[in-house]
A protein has these predicted regions:
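Conserved proline-anchored active-site loop of SAM-dependent methyltransferases
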Residues: 1, 10-17, 175-196
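Conserved dinucleotide-binding and phosphotransfer motif residues
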Residues: 4
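Class I S-adenosyl-L-methionine-dependent methyltransferase module
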Residues: 7, 14-157, 190, 194-225
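RNA-interacting cores
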Residues: 161
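Conserved SAM/SAH-binding loop
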Residues: 167-172
Length: 226
């Protein structure tokens, strides 16, 4: 509908979905990243930022500790295998750099959205899972051994005027919206998105929650579908 000139309002409870939606319906070109102080080397600043993040030195941080076979979870459970140790260290390095840029006011909301969207998409390609992040596979499969790489977003043409992205529960947001056409996705009561995609939510928020139990779930009850 955006490509046909309509204004679009999109909402979801999850933070990672918010970043996807901002990238998809509120942007039609790559952001400039004017406040990020890195050399561009004759490529666009956006590509330079991706190259910089892709080539960071690995960091043995939160993701390495909690979600890789080389780590030792804080709660004393056996090491988890959501990612290879190498990719977990890359995720840590990229997350910490994005967090540093946010703290220094170097990123606009759209720039933050694009980077976190790209990181989440890259993470999905190397995750050692069967479909969701409810649990990991016993052994690292082939795709999990591939290196994590941030790829540029292909921005699409279309209307971006008066588009809105809202994060919250549909039953609350519906009272604020007037629209000609509405699509409402039914809630997932048994397979809660907040639990099954907890790792993506942690990447989206840029935080360091307590990883609970054997699977390393974050506290997600405030986002559960009712």
């Amino acid at each position: 509908y955006r490509k046909r000139g309509y204004s679009v309002i999109a909402s979801d409870m999850m933070t990672y979905t918010k970043w996807h939606l901002i990238t998809q319906i509120m942007m039609d070109r790559e952001p400039r990243f004017e406040e990020v102080d890195i050399p561009s080397h004759h490529v666009s600043k956006y590509q330079a930022v991706l190259d910089y993040l892709n080539n960071l030195e690995p960091v043995e941080g939160y993701f390495f500790r909690e979600f890789s076979p080389g780590g030792t979870p804080a709660n004393g459970t056996a090491s988890r295998k959501y990612f290879s140790s190498e990719n977990a260290c890359k995720i840590d390095a990229i997350r910490e750099t994005i967090n540093k840029w946010i703290a220094s006011n170097c990123l606009s909301e759209q720039e933050e959205a694009v980077l976190k969207h790209s990181l989440i998409m890259a993470v999905n390609t190397v995750a050692n899972i069967s479909g969701t992040y409810g649990y990991y596979l016993a052994e690292l499969k082939k795709n999990a051994l591939e290196p994590l790489v941030l790829l540029p977003v292909r921005f699409s043409e279309g209307n971006i005027q008066n588009n809105r992205v809202i994060q919250g529960f549909a039953e609350d947001i519906a009272q604020e919206i007037t629209a000609d056409l509405c699509y409402i996705d039914p809630p997932y009561i048994k397979r809660q998105y907040a639990a099954n995609y907890h790792i993506l939510e942690t990447i989206a928020r840029g935080d360091y929650p307590e990883a609970q139990g054997k699977s390393g779930l974050r506290d997600w009850w405030d986002q559960h579908s009712k």
